[in-house]
């Protein structure tokens, strides 16, 4: 898991390279601008003194002015080529970043399916600023969750801590307090329902699908999992700012070092049909599944199908009332639908290619009919149908000096020249 470190090492020299190239580009821009100002002054003087001097002097001055204009034009073309080189440099680093992210996501998904979506959403929630209240929330009485840390009025003027530190400390304190409460309550025995998992069931104020912590492991309670998440956030808070991927990696390492087995079960979102009537049923089914997984001595993970869930719940709760048994047996179809909706692991992610794939709508250039990449050179013929060419396709290793024409335009110009002769 060294993708982040390798990429940071790769772009370590990028700011200095960009600064040097932008400085050179600025110097060339000033040079072109000064040359244009001098040429305008010379042109005005030329027209003022044209009638007073001989035709030979006028032709000589005219040729000199045209020569200086062409030199300024070449400098401007060189400045444009430098800008294209800067763009290609940044574009190569962006493509490399996309490739490394795809590889990292594939490795995470191979070990724990669905974990990348949760970690990415958590990172976005931590980094995104608090949004203003819109009309939907203004009319509804649901309070809008604010993730920004609000210091007390007594210390507001004295403290100047960054906003990201506020968010990390707020989340850390919340996770630690939840973990202490759940560890104090605990689970009395293996046959009792897992009451420590109720804090992570479906939340009515979240429209998005939240990760069901109750199904993460069979031997560890939600308190230990919360403590692991708190340690991950604390490790992330100690890192330097600007490394957003560190939070994702720290969270993954915290779960991995504590030997937590991440499941594939997600809690359903608000928009699913029958949410208000089946939320209690989902809570009961989740508790029965976790209690039956705790009761199994072999330590194997509990299956998410309907048969094993109903058999284990009936065997573990033989002394319970007949109403709960009839509830579980009559809702088998609901369990199947929920399990299908809750598994948010698209097959396209697992089968997606790691290599960068180009957009089919991206324009094609060069004689090879490929997209723009690397260093390219433009044909100075305004009517050229292709216009841009890769260095390797036209046999160039460096930027040409002066005007350059592609092989097709060069051949066409030679044919026209031979016809005129």
From Swiss-Prot:
There is a cross-link at residues 148, 165, 167, 256 (Glycyl lysine isopeptide (Lys-Gly) (interchain with G-Cter in SUMO2)). One of its GO terms (molecular function) is zinc ion binding. GO terms for biological process: positive regulation of DNA-templated transcription; positive regulation of double-strand break repair via homologous recombination; regulation of apoptotic process; regulation of cell cycle; regulation of chromatin organization; regulation of double-strand break repair. It is found in: Nucleus. Residues 286-296 have a biased composition (Polar residues). Zn(2+) 2 binds at residues 379, 384, 406, 409. The record marks 365, 376, 380, 388 as: Histone H3K4me3 binding. Zn(2+) 1 binds at residues 366, 368, 390, 393. The modification N6-acetyllysine is found at residues 181, 264. CDD domains: ING_ING3_Yng2p, PHD_ING3. The keyword Zinc applies. Residues 129-163, 286-323 are annotated as: Disordered. The keyword Nucleus applies. InterPro entries: ING3_PHD, ING_fam, ING_N_histone-binding, Zinc_finger_PHD-type_CS, Znf_FYVE_PHD, Znf_PHD, Znf_PHD-finger, Znf_RING/FYVE/PHD. One of its GO terms (cellular component) is nucleus. Residues 308-323 have a biased composition (Low complexity). A zinc finger (PHD-type) spans 363-412. Belongs to the ING family. Component of the NuA4 histone acetyltransferase (HAT) complex which is involved in transcriptional activation of select genes principally by acetylation of nucleosomal histones H4 and H2A. This modification may both alter nucleosome - DNA interactions and promote interaction of the modified histones with other proteins which positively regulate transcription. Interacts with H3K4me3 and to a lesser extent with H3K4me2. Component of the NuA4 histone acetyltransferase complex which contains the catalytic subunit KAT5/TIP60 and the subunits EP400, TRRAP/PAF400, BRD8/SMAP, EPC1, DMAP1/DNMAP1, RUVBL1/TIP49, RUVBL2, ING3, actin, ACTL6A/BAF53A, MORF4L1/MRG15, MORF4L2/MRGX, MRGBP, YEATS4/GAS41, VPS72/YL1 and MEAF6. The NuA4 complex interacts with MYC. HTATTIP/TIP60, EPC1, and ING3 together constitute a minimal HAT complex termed Piccolo NuA4. Component of a SWR1-like complex. This is Inhibitor of growth protein 3. It comes from Mus musculus (Mouse). The gene is Ing3.
């Amino acid at each position: 898991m060294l993708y982040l470190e390798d990429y940071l090492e790769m772009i370590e020299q990028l700011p200095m390279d960009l600064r040097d190239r932008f400085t050179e580009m600025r110097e060339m821009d000033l040079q072109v601008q000064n040359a244009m100002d001098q040429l305008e002054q010379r042109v005005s003087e030329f027209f003022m003194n044209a009638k007073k001097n001989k035709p030979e002097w006028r032709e000589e001055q005219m040729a000199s002015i045209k020569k200086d204009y062409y030199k300024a034009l070449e400098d401007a073309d060189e400045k444009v080529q430098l800008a294209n080189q800067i763009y290609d440099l940044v574009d190569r680093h962006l493509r490399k970043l996309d490739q490394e992210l795809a590889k990292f996501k594939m490795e995470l998904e191979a070990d724990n399916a669905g974990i990348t979506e949760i970690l990415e959403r958590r990172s976005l929630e931590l980094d995104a600023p608090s949004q203003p209240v819109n009309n939907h929330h203004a009319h509804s009485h649901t309070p809008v969750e604010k993730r920004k840390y609000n210091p007390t009025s007594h210390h507001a003027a004295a403290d100047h801590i960054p906003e990201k530190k506020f968010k990390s400390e707020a989340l850390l304190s919340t996770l630690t307090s939840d973990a202490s409460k759940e560890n104090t309550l605990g689970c009395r025995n293996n046959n009792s329902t897992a009451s420590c998992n109720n804090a992570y069931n479906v939340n009515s104020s979240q429209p998005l699908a939240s990760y069901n912590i109750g199904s993460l492991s069979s031997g560890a309670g939600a308190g230990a999992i919360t403590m692991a998440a708190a340690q991950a956030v604390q490790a992330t808070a100690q890192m330097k700012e600007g490394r957003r991927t560190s939070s994702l990696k720290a969270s993954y390492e915290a779960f991995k070092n504590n030997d937590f087995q991440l499941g594939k079960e997600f809690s359903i979102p608000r928009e699913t049909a029958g949410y208000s009537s089946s939320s209690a049923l989902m809570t009961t089914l989740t508790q029965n599944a976790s209690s039956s997984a705790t009761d199994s001595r072999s330590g194997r993970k509990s299956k998410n199908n309907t048969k094993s869930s109903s058999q284990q719940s009936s065997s573990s709760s033989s002394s319970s009332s007949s109403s709960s048994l009839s509830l579980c047996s009559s809702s088998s179809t609901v369990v199947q639908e929920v399990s299908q909706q809750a598994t948010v692991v698209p097959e396209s992610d697992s089968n997606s290619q790691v290599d960068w794939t180009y957009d089919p709508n991206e324009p094609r250039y060069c004689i090879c009919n490929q997209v723009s990449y690397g260093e390219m050179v433009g044909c100075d013929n305004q009517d050229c149908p292709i216009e841009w060419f890769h260095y390797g396709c036209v046999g160039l290793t460096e930027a040409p000096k002066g005007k350059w024409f592609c092989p097709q335009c060069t051949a066409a110009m030679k044919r026209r020249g031979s016809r005129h002769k």
